[in-house]
């Protein structure tokens, strides 16, 4: 399991579910929930993350800006994995610093596995 988890969630209902699940798992001491990905800038510069999961609304491409911000601020370690849940028909233009490793199609969903490069 993970030593520490940082959730970024704006939706109040989803945050309540996260909190309830953390309580159920007795994992509150291993997790924090923040509202905005830009709040990561308040973390220690030494803190690095190795797994990112993006599940934006299908029509929303703003997550690409989030990936750029993570790269610009070096919030990732060398072994990072980025997982993105998209509509299978979506066409996204990723930054050159994001390398797609592989994609999987499940029904109308596309799951993209990638990595941020230094």
Sequence positions of predicted segments:
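Class I S-adenosyl-L-methionine-dependent methyltransferase catalytic core
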Residues: 1-118
């Amino acid at each position: 399991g993970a030593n520490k988890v940082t959730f970024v969630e704006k939706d109040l209902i989803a945050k309540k579910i996260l909190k309830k699940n953390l309580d159920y798992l007795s994992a509150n001491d291993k997790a924090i929930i923040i509202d905005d990905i830009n709040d990561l800038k308040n973390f220690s510069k030494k803190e690095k993350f190795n797994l990112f999961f993006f599940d934006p609304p299908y029509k929303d491409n703003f997550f690409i800006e989030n990936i750029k911000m993570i790269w610009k601020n070096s919030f990732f370690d060398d072994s990072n994995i980025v997982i993105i849940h998209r509509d299978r028909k979506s066409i996204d233009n990723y930054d050159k610093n994001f390398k797609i490793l592989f994609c999987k199609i499940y029904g109308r969903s596309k799951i993209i596995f990638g990595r941020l490069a230094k």
